[in-house]
Regions:
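Central cavity-lining transmembrane alpha-helices of secondary-active solute carriers
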Residues: 46-63, 301, 348-361
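Cytoplasmic helix-loop-helix junction between adjacent transmembrane helices
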Residues: 131-174
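C-terminal transmembrane helical hairpin of 12-TM major facilitator-type secondary transporters
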Residues: 323-337, 342, 348-353, 371-425
Length: 530
C-alpha cells in the first residue's frame, strides 16, 4: 500500500515537474516565433515563484496544510496548477495573437507601483504581451506546484516516517524529449502544442491527487485514526522554527543549491545550442522520425527502472544484471541523442544517473547518516559542472564527438549531484523541528528557496543580454535573424554566477557540519530509528 501511495504522489509531482520546464527546451522557438528575448524569457520563468515570495502564498499554503491536512491540500494544489497552466497555454496560442486581450496586455502592466520602485515587478515596459499573460498563468501554477511540493513532502513523512524518503524525478527528461516534438509536430512550429501537452499531464496529476485522497482516507478508517492534522497554527510556531540556526543553514543551503539547478534547467538546452554545433538531420532520415523519439523515451524508462530496481535486489546476479542492462541502454540512449543532433535530447540524460543512485544515497542517509557531508559533496560537484560548461565545453565547439562526450559526462555528474540534495536535505528537516509544525517548516524552506527561483531565472536572462550587447544590437538592427540570435549567446558569465552559488553552498555546508557537531542536531545521524 505504501509503495502505491509513493507512486501516486511521485507521478503527480512528475507531471508538475514537466510543466515547470515545458518551455525550457524551446527557448529558441519562443524567441523566433513570439519575440521573447532572454530578458522576457527569464522574467516569465521567474514569475512562477513571484506570488509565493512577495504575497507570501507559500507561507499560507503551509498554514493550510497544517490546519486542513494533506488530503485537502493535495487536491487544492492540483486544481490551482491546472488553472494556471491553462492560462499559460492560451497566452502562447495563435488565438491570443492579435486578440483584444493581447492589445490590453501590450498597453497595460507596464508599470506596477511599488514593485517597479523596488525592482521586483514581474512585468516591464516592452515585454511581449504573450509573455505578460503567460507570466500570470505561471504565477498561479507556481502557487499550486509549491503547495504540492510541501504537501507531497508532508505526505511522504506521514507514510514513510523512519523509512526511505527519496523521490525520483524523470519529469525533466520527459519534458526535454517531448516538448520540442510537440512544438514541431507535422513540420509546422506551434509552441502552444508543447504547453497543451503539459496541461493534459496536470489534469492527470489532479486525478492522482484525488485517488490519493480516497486511499489516505481509507487508511485512516482502517486504523481508526482521524486524518493527521497538526496543532492549530500559532505565530510562535514561526518563532520556534526561525530561532533554529540549523534550520536557517539548511534553508540557505537549499536556496543556493536549487537556484543553481532549477534556473539552469530553463536555459540548459539553449546553452548547449550556443556552445556546440548541431547539424540538422535530413527530414527523410530515420533519426528525424517521431518513432525514434518514442523509442528513446522507452529506453530511458528502462534505464531508469533497471538502475532503480537494482538497489532492491538481494541476489548479486540479479543486481549486477540489471546494472549491466542499465549501463548498456544508457550508452544506446546517449548514442541516439547524438544521432538526433538536438540539444534537448542531450540534456535529457540529466536525471538518469540520479535515478540509479538516489536510492543508494537515501539508503545510506537512512542507515549511516552523513547528510551534511553529502550536501557538501553535492555542492562541490555543482561548482565543477558549471565551470566545465563555462570554460571547457566551448573549447569543443568544433569537435562534434568530443563536445557531445563532455556534455554528456558533465550533465550526468550534475544530475548525480542533484540527487545528493533531496536524499540528504529533506529527511533532515524533521530532525530540526517538531513534527506538529513540520508543514510550516517545509513552507518556510520552500519560501526561502522560491526567492532564488524567482531571482535567478530573471538574472540569467538579464546577464545574457547585458554580456551579449553586440548580439542584441545586431538582432535589433536586422543584421542577424531571431533564429540565428537564439543560438549565438555567450553563456560564460551566467555559468560563473551559478558556480559562485555552489561555492557559497559549500561554505554553508561546512558551517552546518560544525553547528551540527556543536549543538547535536543529529544531521549526521541515521534516519532509521533503531
Amino acid at each position: 500500500m505504501r509503495w502505491l501511495v509513493l507512486l501516486l504522489l511521485a507521478f503527480a509531482m512528475f507531471c508538475s515537474y514537466i510543466f515547470m520546464d515545458i518551455l525550457s527546451p524551446i527557448k529558441d522557438l519562443m524567441q523566433s516565433t513570439r519575440g521573447w528575448d532572454s530578458t522576457a524569457f527569464g522574467t516569465m520563468q521567474g514569475s512562477e515563484t513571484f506570488l509565493n515570495v512577495f504575497v507570501f502564498f507559500l507561507i499560507f499554503a503551509g498554514i493550510i496544510l497544517d490546519k486542513m491536512g494533506v488530503r485537502f491540500t493535495a487536491i487544492l494544489s492540483g486544481a490551482v496548477m491546472l488553472v494556471g497552466a491553462t492560462i499559460n497555454w492560451y497566452a502562447v496560442t495563435d488565438a491570443f495573437q492579435g486578440s483584444g486581450l493581447q492589445t490590453w496586455f501590450t498597453n497595460n502592466l507596464n508599470y506596477i507601483p511599488g514593485f517597479d520602485e523596488l525592482g521586483i515587478s514581474p512585468f516591464y515596459r516592452g515585454m511581449p504581451a504573450s509573455a505578460k499573460f503567460a507570466a500570470i498563468g505561471f504565477m498561479i501554477f507556481g502557487c499550486g506546484v509549491e503547495m504540492a511540493g510541501i504537501t507531497v513532502s508532508r505526505g511522504i513523512v506521514k507514510w514513510f516516517k523512519g523509512r526511505e524518503m527519496a523521490l525520483a524525478r524523470l519529469g525533466v527528461a520527459t519534458c526535454m524529449i517531448f516538448s520540442p516534438v510537440f512544438a514541431k509536430l507535422g513540420g509546422v512550429i506551434d509552441v502552444s502544442r508543447s504547453v497543451a501537452f503539459g496541461v493534459v499531464l496536470l489534469l492527470i496529476a489532479l486525478i492522482m491527487f484525488i485517488v490519493y485522497f480516497f486511499m489516505d482516507r481509507k487508511l485512516d478508517a482502517q486504523t481508526g485514526e482521524a486524518e493527521e492534522k497538526d496543532d492549530p497554527f500559532k505565530i510562535s510556531d514561526l518563532g520556534t522554527i526561525l530561532s533554529s540556526s540549523g534550520f536557517w543553514l539548511v534553508a540557505l543551503l537549499c536556496v543556493l543549491y536549487y537556484s543553481a539547478i532549477f534556473p539552469f534547467q530553463k536555459y540548459a538546452v539553449n546553452m548547449l545550442q550556443c556552445n556546440l554545433v548541431f547539424n540538422e538531420v535530413p527530414s527523410d532520415s530515420f533519426w528525424a522520425t517521431n518513432t525514434v523519439t518514442v523509442l528513446q523515451y522507452c529506453i530511458m524508462l528502462v534505464v531508469a527502472g533497471a538502475s532503480f530496481a537494482s538497489n532492491f535486489m538481494k541476489k548479486a546476479g540479479m543486481k549486477y544484471g540489471l546494472l549491466t542492462v542499465a549501463g548498456v541502454l544508457l550508452a544506446v540512449f546517449c548514442y541516439m541523442g547524438y544521432m538526433r543532433q538536438s540539444a534537448e535530447t542531450v540534456f535529457a540524460v540529466f536525471p538518469l544517473l540520479a535515478v540509479g543512485i538516489t536510492p543508494i544515497l537515501g539508503n545510506y542517509v537512512d542507515h549511516k547518516g552523513k547528510a551534511a557531508s553529502m550536501l557538501m559533496v553535492g555542492s562541490m560537484l555543482l561548482v565543477l559542472c558549471h565551470l566545465t560548461f563555462a570554460f571547457v565545453l566551448p573549447e569543443f565547439r568544433d569537435n562534434a564527438i568530443g563536445g557531445i562526450i563532455v556534455a554528456y559526462l558533465t550533465i550526468l555528474v550534475l544530475g548525480a549531484s542533484f540527487s545528493l540534495v533531496p536524499a540528504s536535505l529533506w529527511p533532515s528537516v524533521p530532525k530540526l523541528v517538531d513534527a506538529k509544525i513540520i508543514g510550516s517548516a517545509y513552507a518556510l524552506i520552500f519560501w526561502v528557496q522560491n526567492i532564488g527561483l524567482w531571482l535567478f531565472p530573471l538574472l540569467i536572462g538579464k546577464v545574457l543580454d547585458k554580456t551579449n550587447t553586440q548580439l542584441v544590437a545586431d538582432l535589433k538592427n536586422g543584421v542577424i535573424t531571431p533564429e540565428e540570435a537564439a543560438v549565438s549567446y555567450d553563456y560564460t558569465a551566467p555559468l560563473v554566477m551559478l558556480a559562485c552559488l555552489g561555492i557559497a553552498a559549500l561554505v554553508l555546508g561546512f558551517i552546518l557540519k560544525i553547528v551540527d557537531k556543536k549543538k547535536g542536531l543529529g544531521l549526521e545521524e541515521p534516519n532509521i530509528k533503531a
